[in-house]
Design a protein with these regions (language model features):
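Carbohydrate-active catalytic/glycan-binding domains of CAZyme proteins
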Residues: 1-221
C-alpha cells in the first residue's frame, strides 16, 4: 500500500527519490524545484525506512539558484544519486546544463560528478559548499581510458549510439553502405507528433564547433 513518507522542503515538483541505508540511517534524497534554474537536491533521514524523516539542516545540499551562484556556468543542478567508490570515497552524480551568456543553454542536460564528505553529524556535504564547478580540486579515481570517437564519420559501419532520431525511427528509410548514409524522404515533418520523420543527427556537445558534410540529392530533389 502506498504511503507518503516525506513532502520535501517545499520546492515545487519533488521527484526522483533515492533511499540509501548508511550506518543505521535511511537517507532519502530527492530533487525539487523543477528541471530549470530552480533545480536542487534535498535530503532527509530516518532510523526507519517508512519514517518519520527529518530533513538536513543545510538543505538544499546542492543548488545553484542562489545569488552567489547565478554566475556559475553550470545551472539546473539536480536529479542526483549518491555513489560510494571502491576506495571508500563518496561522490554525487547529477544532471545539469551549461549556460552561455547568462540564460542561454542549448546543449541539453549533461552528467556531472562531485565529491561528497559526511560531516560530524552524519549529513552529506557536496564539494564542501553545496555547489559544483567545471573544475574541482579533488583526489581522482583511477583513470579508465576509453577509445575516443573519430572526428570524421566515413559511414563504413552501422550508426552507433551517438546518433539520434526523432521518436521511433523507420529503419527502412536509412541505409549505410559504400561509405554513404542514404536517407529516403517521408511525408512527416519535424513537428509530427506521432510518427518519425526522416531525420538523423547527433547532439551538440560544445557551444562553438565546426561541422561539414557532403550531400547528394536524389531525383526528387
Amino acid at each position: 500500500e502506498p504511503r507518503m513518507i516525506w513532502y520535501g522542503t517545499g520546492g515545487r515538483y519533488p521527484e526522483a527519490p533515492h533511499i540509501y541505508k548508511k550506518d543505521g540511517w535511511y537517507y532519502l534524497l530527492i530533487s525539487e524545484g523543477g528541471t530549470e534554474f530552480g533545480h536542487m537536491e534535498t535530503i532527509a533521514r530516518s532510523r526507519y525506512i517508512d519514517g518519520p524523516y527529518k530533513e538536513a539542516p543545510h538543505n538544499p545540499i546542492l543548488a545553484h539558484y542562489k545569488a552567489a551562484t547565478q554566475d556559475n556556468p553550470i545551472q539546473g543542478v539536480g536529479h542526483a544519486d549518491l555513489v560510494q567508490a571502491h576506495d571508500g570515497s563518496w561522490w554525487l552524480v547529477c544532471l545539469a546544463f551549461r549556460v552561455n551568456h547568462g540564460l542561454v543553454h542549448l546543449l541539453g542536460r549533461e552528467t556531472f560528478v562531485a565529491p561528497v564528505r559526511w560531516d560530524k553529524n552524519a549529513w552529506p556535504v557536496v564539494n564542501g559548499n553545496g555547489e559544483i564547478a567545471l573544475k574541482m580540486d579533488v583526489p581522482t579515481l583511477p583513470l579508465q581510458p576509453f577509445e575516443a570517437e573519430p572526428a570524421r564519420n566515413e559511414f563504413d559501419q552501422p550508426l552507433g549510439p551517438k546518433w539520434s532520431w526523432l521518436r521511433k525511427p523507420v529503419t527502412e528509410r536509412y541505409q549505410v553502405a559504400d561509405g554513404k548514409l542514404r536517407m529516403y524522404g517521408s511525408a512527416e515533418g519535424l513537428n509530427e507528433l506521432q510518427n518519425s520523420p526522416s531525420f538523423v543527427g547527433f547532439r551538440q556537445e560544445d557551444f562553438n564547433f565546426q561541422a561539414e558534410t557532403c550531400v547528394e540529392l536524389g531525383k526528387a530533389g
